[in-house]
Regions:
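N-terminal secretory signal peptides that target proteins for export/translocation
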Residues: 1-5
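Juxtamembrane cytosolic interface motif at the C-terminal end of transmembrane helices
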Residues: 21-23
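Extended, histidine- and acidic-residue-enriched regions that form the cofactor-binding/catalytic faces
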Residues: 25-117, 122-127, 138-150, 157-316
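Helix-loop module immediately N-terminal to the HCX5R catalytic loop
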Residues: 133
Length: 316
């Protein structure tokens, strides 16, 4: 049977058109990404609360899939004039909360019974030695590390003796785990913004929605007492930083320790609370906490990938 060339050409063209039409109906693959551009990062899911202890285990597990950051406020309980005895812990917790909000971290609360340092004359003071505090805190730090919180940042505010507990804690934790933790003295950050520490205490209660815990129109009874002239002289000649540096042991009365001992009105409490909260916020902003937590991550990576393999004789 003779088939002309035109018929063959027509049939071939028709088959090609049918194939093209059929292919057009198939699902199409997405276009390839532009060379050199990474896919847009998926934002981490928001946490319901910043407080570790208020999350469910499911929420903690989910958080640890994309982050490993936890802020740990450390405080004490001691007599402090018109303020509740936990005020220095509250100040540390408020600052830790603000830092966590800045960096998508969590807060590990309730660690408020450590060495109070000065001002321990008073039955409202719970005395815990630095050694006892470290012995309590270190297992918690190690547990948090095992759980996945590799970046631990410890915060104190208001207690000059806090380094007696927290500095040895972070050092011993590093020697034992080879994981650097960070200790931030909130007082240093607050001084950089010229904060008034009494107002900071009021602001901290406001940040934590506990302002009503500060009593109104209340004047504490401070026993009349002599001045420790020897300690006063040592301080003036800068030969001793007191309990902070472990150079000389001492105790103080509330008024000597700088605690507010005059009655506070409702208007004054509200005004100081707002000013103090603003000071805490300013101190955290000035510190650039996102840079701090990234730097801690970089330091940990350098330690793990360079220092430890190269210098196996690091303290154990």
């Amino acid at each position: 049977m003779f088939v002309s060339g035109k018929s063959v050409l027509f049939a071939g063209t028709l088959s090609l058109l049918i194939a093209v039409a059929a292919r057009a109906q198939l699902p199409q693959a997405p276009p390839p990404p532009t060379p050199g551009l990474a896919p847009a990062p998926v934002p981490p899911p928001p946490v319901r609360t910043r407080y570790f202890t208020s999350l469910t285990n499911i929420e903690v597990e989910k958080y640890l899939q994309y982050n490993d950051l936890i802020f740990i406020p450390i405080g004490n309980v001691q007599a402090y004039g018109v303020l509740p005895v936990d005020c220095e812990y509250v100040a540390a917790e408020a600052m830790a909360l603000k830092m966590a909000e800045e960096t998508d971290g969590l807060v590990f609360p309730y660690l408020q019974f450590t060495y109070p340092g000065d001002g321990i004359i008073g039955r409202g003071t719970v005395h815990v030695s630095p050694a006892a505090g470290i012995a309590y805190l270190k297992p918690i730090a190690r547990s948090l590390l095992r759980q996945g919180f590799k970046r631990q940042i410890y915060i104190t505010v208001g207690n000059n003796a806090a380094p007696e507990t927290v500095s040895p804690l972070v050092l011993e934790f590093f020697y034992e785990t080879k994981t650097p933790a960070l200790y931030i003295e909130g007082d240093v950050l607050l001084r950089k913004v010229n904060a008034d520490f009494t107002k900071v205490m009021f602001g901290a209660y406001s940040v934590l929605n506990r302002l009503d815990d500060i009593p109104l129109n209340f004047t504490p009874t401070v026993a009349k007492h002599d001045i420790d002239q020897g300690l006063a002289t040592l301080r003036m000649i800068n030969s001793s930083g007191g309990a902070r540096d472990g150079i000389v042991g001492f105790v103080m009365f509330e008024d000597d320790a700088g605690a507010p001992v005059k009655a506070v009105t409702a208007e004054q409490r509200a005004a100081w609370a707002k000013e103090g909260a603003d000071m805490i916020e300013a101190a955290v902003k000035q510190a650039d906490m996102k840079k701090v937590v990234q730097s801690l991550l970089d330091h940990q990576r350098f330690t793990r990938e360079y220092l430890i393999p190269k210098f196996d004789s690091l303290p154990r």
